UniProtKB/Swiss-Prot annotation:
Name of the protein in its database record: Bifunctional protein FolD
EC number: 1.5.1.5, 3.5.4.9
Pathway participation: One-carbon metabolism; tetrahydrofolate interconversion
Keyword Amino-acid biosynthesis: yes
CDD domains, alphabetized: NAD_bind_m-THF_DH_Cyclohyd
Function: Catalyzes the oxidation of 5,10-methylenetetrahydrofolate to 5,10-methenyltetrahydrofolate and then the hydrolysis of 5,10-methenyltetrahydrofolate to 10-formyltetrahydrofolate.
Gene for this chain: folD
Cited HAMAP family: THF_DHG_CYH
Signal peptide per UniProt: none
Species for this entry: Limosilactobacillus reuteri (strain DSM 20016)
Length: 286
């Protein structure tokens, strides 16, 4: 019988642990973890997602500051705000919501965030540590961190397994490649333009799809008994949310699969909150 990986339930468990830890930090050490969420523009989906993060932080007892800028904000203005947040002792974590308006360079903006406050784990210093599999305290991209947590929670063995990632983004695909490789999986990365993608995905014991293409992966693209992680979240013309995987068809072949919604999405926010607390702890305790 196929296991449906319940990201919503696991996220609830993580959030409960985070809330308890935040309360203990406040009571015993007078530490209040803080996050600043920065958004530029009026993309509806981004605004909703940003508001959800802000509200979740407040609910867990984290000090959350929402910095909203108009779509025509200059890069200099946004960089000046990030610099202020870098030096703000009440802020442990800085998140810049993407996508950004076209006049802003995501690489420049990301690199301006102090590595020690880079809650998305996208600063080159943090990415370099991840790819080098360095020990120590540094942030890791939240969605990949959440995926690894799900795999661990469901006792999915990665040692020596073939893992295929479809999607090469810096937010998901590339950090996940490093994490899976560090866990001793044999990892292949592909994209939508990969020749004979189906032949490749059918070799996967662990298949992770993050392309933003609704129902890209069909049952015929999946090896029987594979573990399928669907990172995509797409809204169809009828308003229905769907992933990058044809869930109903693929679940008949998979050993385990994440639904959309209720799979990876809740885990991303839960790990964002968890990592904000980590950053606060590391800042005060090294």
């Amino acid at each position: 019988m196929t296991t449906i990986i319940d990201g919503k339930a696991l996220a609830k468990k993580i959030n409960s642990q985070t809330k308890e830890l935040v309360a203990q930090l406040k009571e015993k050490q007078n530490i209040i973890p803080g996050i600043a969420v920065v958004i530029a523009g009026d993309d509806v989906a981004s605004l909703i997602y940003t508001r959800n993060k802000h509200n979740k932080a407040i609910k867990l007892g984290i000090n959350s500051v929402l910095k909203k800028f108009p779509a025509d904000v200059s890069q200099a203005e946004l960089l000046a705000e990030i610099e202020k947040l870098n030096h703000d002792d009440t802020i442990d974590a800085i998140l810049v919501q993407q996508p950004l308006p076209p006049q802003l360079d995501p690489e420049v903006i990301t690199n301006a965030i102090l590595p020690t406050k880079d809650v998305d784990g996208l600063n080159p210093l943090n990415l370099g540590k991840l790819f080098a599999n360095q020990h120590g305290n540094y942030p890791v991209a939240c969605t990949p961190r959440g995926i690894m947590r799900m795999l661990a929670e469901y006792n999915i063995d990665l040692q020596g397994k073939n893992a295929v990632i479809v999607g090469r983004s810096i937010l998901v695909g590339k950090p996940l490649l490093a994490l899976l490789n560090n866990a001793n999986a044999t990892v292949t990365m592909a994209g939508r333009s990969t020749g004979d993608l189906s032949a490749l995905t059918k070799t996967a014991d662990i298949l992770i799809v993050a392309t933003g293409v609704p129902n890209l992966i069909k049952a015929t693209d999946v090896k029987p008994g594979a573990v399928v992680i669907d990172v995509g979240i797409n809204r169809l013309s009828n308003g229905k949310l769907t992933g990058d995987v044809d869930f109903e068809a693929v679940k008949t072949k998979a050993q385990a699969i994440t639904p959309v919604p209720g799979g990876v999405g809740p885990m991303t926010i839960a790990t964002l909150m968890e990592q904000t607390v980590d950053l606060a702890w590391w800042r005060h305790h090294g």
